[in-house]
């Protein structure tokens, strides 16, 4: 749930950062993130009647991996930087609780096990190439 502080910080970000150029926001607008949604059913099988904690959005998790690759961050450093940098939060599209580093690691491992990690990078790169970026 967004708070008044979230809106205030976002307003300041929009007024002071975006006019000077935010490469992550520009990158985010180039990608059709919905193209990644079909792999979700291959990764998660919510068959338990007991429920449990809901999965974090697959798009948010993929964006974590992209940030990690772009900035050369370890899993613990990624967690710290996402907590610290508002531009990362804007790129992720959330001010909600962020996954800890072990969740990012487990997500990447799950992608590897299902052969989806390569698909994600190919899709990401192909979309950027289609927009004229190499």
Task: Go through the PLM ranges and name each one.
Residues 41, 45, 83-84, 109, ...:
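Short amphipathic alpha-helical surface patches that mediate protein-protein
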Residues 19-22, 31, 35, 73, ...:
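Generic recognition of stable, solvent-exposed alpha-helical segments in well-folded globular domains
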């Amino acid at each position: 749930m967004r708070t008044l502080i979230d809106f205030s910080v976002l307003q300041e970000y929009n007024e002071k950062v975006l006019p000077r150029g935010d490469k992550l926001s520009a990158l985010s607008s180039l990608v059709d993130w919905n193209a990644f949604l079909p792999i979700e059913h291959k990764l998660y099988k919510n068959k338990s009647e007991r429920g449990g904690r809901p999965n974090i959005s697959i798009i948010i998790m993929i964006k974590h991996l992209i940030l990690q690759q772009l900035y050369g961050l370890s899993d613990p450093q990624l967690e710290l930087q996402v907590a610290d940098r508002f531009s990362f939060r804007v790129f992720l599209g959330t001010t909600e609780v962020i996954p800890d580093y072990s969740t990012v690691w487990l997500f990447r491992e799950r992608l590897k096990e299902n052969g989806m990690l390569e698909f994600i990078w190919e899709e990401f790169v192909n979309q950027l190439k289609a927009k004229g970026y190499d």
